[in-house]
Amino acid sequence: MHVTLVEINVHEDKVDEFIEVFRQNHLGSVQEEGNLRFDVLQDPEVNSRFYIYEAYKDEDTVAFHKTTPHYKTCVAKLESLMTGPRKKRLFNGLMP
């Protein structure tokens, strides 16, 4: 299992817009073959900080995810909402 944890920080006045932009990515991602989990989390202490927990069957399904229209649209729209680049950490999923 291929797991990615992504931290995304957005401008405080863009939180609602971020949630709507990412909702579309979430809805598309959970329908993908090979997607095991796609959670969007909001930091309770920093309202404008989000974490995305993505679990995919393998690297091929991750590669496919990055070709989908919902992913590409989301990434393009995120640029103006973020305070800096996304931070990604990769993990090997052992016990889902």
Curated annotation (Swiss-Prot):
Localization, UniProt: Cytoplasm
Main location: cytoplasm
Pfam families the record matches: ABM (PF03992)
Self-association state and partner proteins as the record states: Homodimer.
Keyword Cytoplasm belongs to the record: yes
Protein name: (4S)-4-hydroxy-5-phosphonooxypentane-2,3-dione isomerase
Keywords: Cytoplasm, Isomerase
SUPFAM superfamilies registered for this protein in UniProt: Dimeric alpha+beta barrel
Entry's family note: Belongs to the LsrG family.
Gene label: lsrG
Enzyme Commission number(s) from the entry: 5.3.1.32
GO MF, one annotated term: oxidoreductase activity
Coiled coil: none
